[in-house]
Swiss-Prot record:
This is NAC domain-containing protein 12. Transcriptional activator of genes involved in biosynthesis of secondary walls. Together with NST1, required for the secondary cell wall thickening and lignification of sclerenchymatous fibers and secondary xylem vessels (tracheary elements). Seems to repress the secondary cell wall thickening of xylary fibers. May also regulate the secondary cell wall lignification of other tissues. Binds to and activates the promoter of MYB46. Pfam families: NAM (PF02365). One of its GO terms (molecular function) is transcription cis-regulatory region binding. Stems and roots, specifically in interfascicular fibers (sclerenchyma), cells differentiating into vascular vessels (cambium), and xylem. It comes from Arabidopsis thaliana (Mouse-ear cress). InterPro entries: NAC-dom, NAC_dom_sf.
Length: 358
């Protein structure tokens, strides 16, 4: 091959056998192909061609260095070692579209615990230095180790060191980085496209009372009042606002109730909130949660007017403390507003727990 070009086809047919793959190891590239090339020895199957790295782009190399007709993931070629710029000592690896930039440290290649060469990794950047754009093209440049051996081996390169450094050969392997994706190509996720999970996780609020029952309001109100035990005085204003909202809620209804409960007592204009604001920090809270659980469970399970259940509940109340002591929801001053008493007076015909109020 005097023209230094690899022609693997004769009359349109490949010279290599079908299924031929060229996948040499690093040791084979250095110890066989590159060493024979440096020593001008004949290579049995000369499939690696010579390439001027400054005249070919990475995407052109895969066409020039193709071996056979089978698909390839990497391409091999010989190139001049450390070709310098005309007016300097820096290695010239620039092409028309970009440049090859070395990255990292050189890796030592060994054979049988013996150093035979080095591998340099380079990345192709599009544009001009130092503002090039990194691409997915990678090149491994293999060169023989021209350091004098001190272990007595005889196969040291016999050429002039200066001539070898300036006019030597390297064997290169070019490939594309796997799973390479640009950040600009990734789909952008906006906040508007995300599902609104926060709204679904929120519990019922006082501003949306259409799908919330009166019992839910009572439970939520009791839970908030129970937390006043550890609440500082600076948060009493917020608690007072919750109390006002609670007064505007619809009253409880029994399952058999067909007529709405009179809500005239819930009108904000007829309520005087000044005692509530004055006594907000002195109001006792519900501390017996066991009694509250029993009361709620009884109302849910025994909401119908069942004389047997009512009688058993009355007997249980007579044997224990009064519900006034268990709940501690009434205020000591009779002149102040009693929310629970007003609630029971208005729903006396519907509330099965009327006898529990004092």
């Amino acid at each position: 091959m005097a023209d230094n070009k690899v022609n693997l086809s004769i009359n349109g047919q490949s010279k290599v056998p079908p299924g031929f793959r060229f996948h040499p190891t690093e040791e084979e590239l250095l110890h066989y192909y590159l060493r024979k090339k440096v020593n001008s020895q004949k290579i049995d199957l000369d499939v690696i061609r010579e390439v001027d790295l400054n005249k070919l782009e990475p995407w052109d190399i895969q066409e020039e260095c193709r071996i056979g007709s089978t698909p390839q993931n990497d391409w091999y070629f010989f190139s001049h070692k450390d070709k310098k710029y005309p007016t300097g000592t820096r290695t010239n690896r620039a092409t028309v579209a970009g440049f090859w930039k070395a990255t990292g440290r050189d890796k030592i290649i060994c054979s049988c615990v013996r150093r035979i060469g080095l591998r340099k990794t380079l990345v192709f950047y599009k544009g001009r230095a130092p503002h090039g754009q990194k691409s997915d093209w990678i090149m491994h440049e293999y060169r023989l180790d021209d350091t004098p051996m001190s272990n007595g081996y005889a196969d040291v390169v016999t050429e002039d060191p200066m001539s070898y450094n300036e006019e030597g050969w390297v064997v290169c392997r070019v490939f594309r980085k796997k799973n390479y994706q640009k950040i600009d190509d990734c789909p952008k996720i906006t906040l508007s496209s995300l599902p609104d999970d926060t709204e679904e996780e929120k519990g019922p609020t006082f501003h949306n009372t259409q799908n919330v029952t009166g019992l839910d309001h009572v439970l939520l109100y009791m839970d908030r009042t129970g937390s006043n035990i550890c609440m500082p005085e600076s948060q009493t204003t917020t608690q007072h606002q919750d109390d006002v909202l609670f007064m505007q809620l619809p009253s409880l209804e029994t399952p058999k109730s067909e007529s709405p409960v009179d809500q005239s007592f819930l009108t904000p204009s007829k309520l005087d909130f000044s005692p509530v604001q004055e006594k907000i920090t002195e109001r006792p809270v519900c501390s017996n949660w066991a009694s509250l659980d029993r009361l709620v469970a009884w109302q849910l399970n025994n909401g119908h007017h069942n004389p047997c259940h009512r009688k058993s509940f009355d007997e249980e109340e007579e044997n224990g403390d009064t519900m006034m002591q268990r709940w501690d929801l009434h205020w000591n001053n009779d002149d102040n507003v009693d929310l629970w008493s007003s609630f029971t007076e208005s729903s006396s015909s519907l509330d099965p727990l009327l006898h529990l109020s004092v």
